């Protein structure tokens, strides 16, 4: 959970990290898109799902 706490200081895009499966397919992965949206809109400990 410490990874998401860095979201306040670091960039919003690094706040949410995609699932392990999404790392292989970055472009076609839907989970990564949802994670980035979560960071941009609500980037305060709201990204625990991803």
Curated annotation (Swiss-Prot):
It holds the Pfam family Protamine_P1. One of its GO terms (biological process) is sperm DNA condensation. Its main location: nucleus. It comes from the Eukaryota. It is found in: Nucleus; Chromosome. One of its GO terms (cellular component) is nucleosome. Testis. Keywords: Chromosome, Developmental protein, Differentiation, DNA condensation, DNA-binding, Nucleosome core, Nucleus, Spermatogenesis. GO terms for molecular function: DNA binding. Protamines substitute for histones in the chromatin of sperm during the haploid phase of spermatogenesis. They compact sperm DNA into a highly condensed, stable and inactive complex. Belongs to the protamine P1 family. This is Sperm protamine P1. It comes from Trachypithecus vetulus (Purple-faced langur). The lineage of its organism: Eukaryota, Metazoa, Chordata, Craniata, Vertebrata.
